[in-house]
Amino acid sequence: MTKDRVRIVYRNNYERIVEESNVRNFNALVEWMEDFNEGNLVPSLVLFGRDLGSNFSINKSNVKTIEFID
């Protein structure tokens, strides 16, 4: 399985699919996801999209689930 797509489900049930090719700091997202899923304390993370103005942030209080998808 290629691990190049991550599904984020927010507490308001909004779902976002993040692909490695669309985010500059995808590895930081993967590290954040692993820490989050292990129950560790995680800081806010700003993800930088490849398109101008496509940045977004995630934090522990607004994410319900985060996982790799096929």
Each predicted region: which residue ranges?
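Absolute protein N-terminus
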Residues: 1-2, 70
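N-terminal acidic leader/helix
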Residues: 2-32
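Intrinsic disorder/low-complexity segments enriched in polar/small residues
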Residues: 16, 20-21, 35, 61, ...
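A short, charged, amphipathic alpha-helix used as a generic interaction element across diverse proteins
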Residues: 26-44
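Short, mixed-charge low-complexity intrinsically disordered segments
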Residues: 39-70
